[in-house]
Swiss-Prot record:
It is an enzyme of class 3 (hydrolase). This is Kynurenine formamidase. Keywords: Hydrolase, Tryptophan catabolism. Homodimer. One of its GO terms (biological process) is L-tryptophan catabolic process to kynurenine. The keyword Cell division does not apply. Catalyzes the hydrolysis of N-formyl-L-kynurenine to L-kynurenine, the second step in the kynurenine pathway of tryptophan degradation. Kynurenine may be further oxidized to nicotinic acid, NAD(H) and NADP(H). Required for elimination of toxic metabolites. The active site is at S103 (nucleophile), D196, H228. It comes from Meyerozyma guilliermondii (strain ATCC 6260 / CBS 566 / DSM 6381 / JCM 1539 / NBRC 10279 / NRRL Y-324) (Yeast). Its EC number is 3.5.1.9. GO terms for molecular function: arylformamidase activity.
């Protein structure tokens, strides 16, 4: 998209944000978080270009890049995502937000909900209201991932210093306090392709069980959405996100004060 531009939220070359579309008159923003096993430089905010083109122009759209392993370890990836969101909240007045995360981007989206617990000493609010969360073929329980796919320990060990660190990485694998960001009235979508060659449905089922145990409403969508790196390009996934956008825009319009 030729109209997009890049922003820096830190000194590292990877601490960048792609602004796909921004209009101060828009009331809803989507922030995309890419996957790539915390380490693959081939996965970037550019992954979502095709998806953005299928979404309504009445929303702001941003993509986040973050530092990769093994150069950095957990929780540096989350620190970067938090910093990027804070940058957008401060400089672009982003308030009503939907997060879309793919693979470990979904992990990071989940971690955002407990960012104060995972990042000790960070007590300040992010300045956003979470309107919807879309988890695409995500990783939610790292210990269970390694148990199911022992060879995946290679990239997990690059991203985390110790086993204890990745056991405590998300609220699904470790008991954590209530979320630091409210998900009340937040639309939550769990999306999993049955054609994913890298992740079985187990991670999505673990996440669904977690949300059910917390009595948090969600929608689960299993379908033939393509291979792991095709899910976020699939037209049916774009439709699911568009529907979540529509529900939120309707609510925001109704909530606007009348002149």
């Amino acid at each position: 998209m030729s109209s997009s531009k890049l922003l820096k939220y830190g000194s590292d070359d990877l601490q960048t944000i792609r602004v796909y579309r921004h209009d101060s008159g828009n009331h809803l923003s989507i922030i995309f978080i890419h996957g790539g096993a915390w380490r693959d430089p081939r996965n970037t905010f550019n992954d979502f270009e095709e998806l953005v083109g299928k979404l309504p122009s009445t929303i702001n759209t941003f993509g986040i890049n973050y530092r990769l392993s093994p150069a950095v370890k957990h929780p540096a990836h989350l620190e970067d995502v938090v910093s990027a969101i804070e940058y957008l909240a401060k400089n672009y007045k982003v308030e009503n937000v939907g997060l879309v995360g793919h693979s470990v981007g979904a992990t990071l989206a989940l971690q955002i909900l407990n960012y104060k617990t995972i990042l000790p000493g960070l007590e300040r609010p992010l300045g956003i209201k979470m309107k919807f969360l879309v988890f695409l073929d995500g990783i939610y329980d790292v210990p269970k991932l390694v148990e199911e796919y022992p060879t995946y320990s290679s990239f997990v060990n690059e991203a985390f210093k110790t086993k204890q660190d990745y056991m405590r990485a998300t609220p699904v694998s470790s008991e954590m306090p209530q979320f630091d960001i409210s998900v009340e009235k937040c639309v939550i979508l769990l999306v999993q392709s049955t054609e994913d060659e890298l992740l079985s449905v187990q991670q999505t089922e673990l996440m669904a069980d977690f949300l059910q145990a917390k009595s948090i409403p969600f929608e689960k969508h299993l379908g033939a959405f393509g291979a792991h790196e095709q899910v976020y390009r699939h037209h049916k996934v774009a439709k699911l996100i568009t529907d979540a956008i529509g529900a939120n825009l309707d609510g925001l319009v109704r909530a606007r004060p009348q002149n």
